[in-house]
């Protein structure tokens, strides 16, 4: 049985994602913030943490990236991809909607809907979509933009549902564990994630990306976050196709390790969308294995 911490309270999209990772007997534990969910794993209070990492409309989730870059390292072992549309909840006693609360990422994804349908309402940021529902229930605000599942947990009425400015919006979530972990087996449709602190000099990022390009590795995400301690320095969060068990990926990670003053491995796991890696000619795993075997034979004096 595992305890899975998640960015709560109950009724968030992250809770929905966490449920996709559950096995029989597992327990969900709500955390007030993303850093607290991850720290629960670091302290041994939870076996894993489910956190949002990126949204197709608003991009990366800064709180997740920043929390994974520092502190005791955690490793991702699985990902989930959820379609994102919202419900607008209110109390029975509310007449005119004057205030609407939600998490900033949620508000950004329904901005146009709010302008068209509640043009006079003041928009207020909350810690999470479910926290907004709690605040509406307590009378602090008139309405909340929430995950559809929130209505099952809070005694509020649905003012609108299937709300989204972008119909095919999705959010990706990671399941993080504390090492040592058993890495998932490669599937052929995998993603590897790292964070690299590169030297502050001309061409550093180009050098990192070249290490991937020369090995035929396709980049799926690149984000930069400030180092916090050193002004003008950044950490690069890089996702790419493939699994660390593959020779070409392992070779690339070794090269990145040589070039960067710090590289943190954030996991290799099956892609939730099932998209297989695009492998260029001469970049297949067998190509790397054959080349390594040839060099070994040359070193032994057996091959010219």
Swiss-Prot record:
Q: Report the residue ranges that make up the ACT domain in this protein.
A: 193-271
CDD domains given for it? ACT_CM-PDT, PBP2_Aa-PDT_like
Q: Name the NCBIfam families for this protein.
A: PRK11898.1
| A biological-process GO annotation | L-phenylalanine biosynthetic process
Q: Give the classification, highest ranks.
A: Bacteria, Bacillati, Actinomycetota, Actinomycetes, Pseudonocardiales
Which key words tag this protein in UniProt?
Answer: Amino-acid biosynthesis, Aromatic amino acid biosynthesis, Lyase, Phenylalanine biosynthesis
Q: In which pathway does it act?
A: Amino-acid biosynthesis; L-phenylalanine biosynthesis; phenylpyruvate from prephenate: step 1/1
Residue stretches making up the Prephenate dehydratase domain: 3-178
Site features described as Essential for activity, chain residue numbers: 171
Q: Which reaction does it catalyse?
A: prephenate + H(+) = 3-phenylpyruvate + CO2 + H2O
Q: Which organism is it from?
A: Amycolatopsis methanolica
Instruction: Provide the top EC class.
Output: lyase
Q: Does the keyword section mention Amino-acid biosynthesis?
A: yes
Keyword Amino-acid biosynthesis found? yes
Q: What is its EC number?
A: 4.2.1.51
One GO MF term: prephenate dehydratase activity
Q: Which Pfam families match?
A: ACT, PDT
Gene3D superfamilies named among the record's database cross-references: 3.30.70.260, Periplasmic binding protein-like II
Q: Quick one: which gene encodes this? A: pheA
Source domain of life is Bacteria
* The protein, known as: Prephenate dehydratase
Show the GO cellular component annotation of the record: cytoplasm
């Amino acid at each position: 049985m595992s305890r899975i911490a998640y960015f709560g309270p109950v009724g968030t999209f992250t809770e929905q994602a966490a449920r996709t990772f559950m096995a029989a007997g597992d327990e969900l534990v709500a955390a007030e913030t993303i850093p607290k969910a991850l720290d629960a794993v670091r302290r041994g209070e939870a076996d894993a943490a489910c956190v949002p990492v990126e949204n197709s409309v608003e991009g990366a989730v800064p709180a997740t990236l920043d929390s994974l870059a520092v502190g005791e390292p955690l490793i991702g072992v699985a990902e989930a991809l959820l379609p994102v549309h919202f419900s607008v909840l209110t109390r029975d006693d509310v007449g005119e909607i004057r205030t609407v609360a939600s998490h900033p990422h949620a508000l950004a994804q329904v901005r146009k809907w709010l302008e068209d349908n509640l043009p006079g309402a003041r928009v207020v940021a909350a810690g999470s979509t479910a926290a907004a529902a709690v605040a509406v229930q307590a009378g602090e605000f008139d309405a909340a933009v929430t995950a559809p599942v929130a209505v099952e947990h809070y005694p509020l009425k649905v003012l609108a549902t299937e709300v989204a400015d972008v119909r095919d919006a999705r959010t990706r979530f990671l399941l993080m564990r504390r090492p040592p972990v058993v890495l998932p087996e490669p599937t052929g449709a995998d993603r590897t994630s790292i964070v690299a602190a590169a030297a502050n000099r001309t061409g550093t990022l180009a050098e990192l990306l070249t290490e991937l390009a020369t090995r035929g590795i396709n980049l799926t995400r690149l984000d930069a976050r400030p180092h916090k301690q050193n002004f003008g320095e950044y950490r690069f969060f890089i996702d790419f196709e493939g699994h660390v068990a593959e020779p070409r990926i392992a070779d690339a990670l070794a090269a990145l390790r040589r070039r960067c003053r710090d590289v943190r491995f954030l996991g290799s796991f099956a892609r939730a969308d099932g998209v297989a890696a695009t492998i260029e000619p001469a970049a297949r795993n067998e190509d790397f294995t054959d080349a390594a075997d040839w060099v070994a034979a040359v070193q032994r004096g057996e091959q010219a």
